[in-house]
Amino acid sequence: MEIPLNRQIGENMTNKSFATKFLGMCILLALCSVCVFAEAKKYEPVTEKTITEDGVMLPGYTYPYKWNSEISGDPVLFEEVWGYVMISRLKDYDDETPLTDVGLFAAEVNSYGELTNVPKRSAVGTKFKGRVHLVTICESTSLSHFCIDPKYGVRDKIVEGLLEAVEEFDGLQVDWELIPGRDADNFYSFLKELKKGLGKKPLTVCVPARTKTLNQDVYSYEKIGKIADRIMIMAYDEHWTGGPAGSIASMDWCEKIADYAKTVWPANKYIFGLPFYGRIWGNKSVKQALAFNGMNRTAHENNVVTIERERGVPHYNYTVSVDVEGWYEDAYSIVERSRMYKKKGYKCIAFWRMGQEDVAVWDWIGNKKTGTDPLTVQIGIKALEEKEEEKN
């Protein structure tokens, strides 16, 4: 068994002269280290953070945001501009933004096939004069199967509940993104029942982005378009958290989606979804579950020298270097993408979600009825500055 270092020192230092010499050497080394450190620190150069030039942007937590590319030209106006508002994030919603439609998110389905968290139309306030659509979601593949397959006896209850909840709304949007492939026919008949019960109120259905027709696609644009009044294409998440880093919605990818969609239905059948958010990726992920040997090996490989205990339970810390890559959207990228959609003949866009945006976007994006909102930028900046003051 290896003898601890402190025990070795204690056994070797048996005579007083050796101990005295050893102590003197330690003091001398410590003084030398302090002098060297002080000298190094004394002449350490001072660097200042400056704004990077040559078209490279250095983002900072300051407002207004600094662009490396200025927006120019005319504002982009659409027939319809939708914005999604989460019922749990109402404070992020500004009812003065130039929207024609609000998607209120969301009426959920629980494990028993019951509607829960059904929002009220009044949540968006009385200032907004546009249309408000109830959005319904089901965030589980197995639960989606359970809810839309008639043999389980819950589908009728869900349809009835949604039709009752939508009475105070202007329309219903189905955002069920995890329908199993074998449930395609059940999904279409589910949509037909909803459409029949809605009467003159519009039914919109959210579908993932497609650049071509897929075999046995449960989200077939052609089949869903025969039932729904409108199709909302979620033209984002080209790259997601679990995959390689990249744009949330690159321009080339979005152009392919826009070109394909028109081969199935006319442009006025669609609402094109745009992202307000971004994502960050790292080249390393340290989260994992390990056996004792793995924990021990990891500590050794990362030069852990101290094991601490909390009421007997061991734990340690070490630092690793991570390369980070972030992709996001600002007013410039959103305006460019919106112009592309409009140029291709699309008249309706939607944003996921309100409160995540670069507020300058509302100087450039608007609807043909009310135009853009030049005051929104200043309103947003003021609100953000007030939040910063509260923190300080």
Language-model features, listed with the residues they occupy:
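Glycoside hydrolase catalytic-domain groove-lining segments
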Residues: 114-128, 243-275, 282-284, 295-310
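Bacterial N-terminal signal peptides
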Residues: 24-33
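Conserved, well-ordered alpha-helix/loop/beta-strand core segments that scaffold catalytic motifs
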Residues: 337-351, 356-357
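N-terminal module-boundary/linker segments of secreted carbohydrate-active enzymes
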Residues: 39-85, 92-93
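Glycan-binding loop/region signatures in secreted carbohydrate-active enzymes
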Residues: 53-69, 269, 274-340, 361, ...
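Short, Lys/Arg-enriched N-terminal segments with co-localized hydrophobic residues
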Residues: 1-12
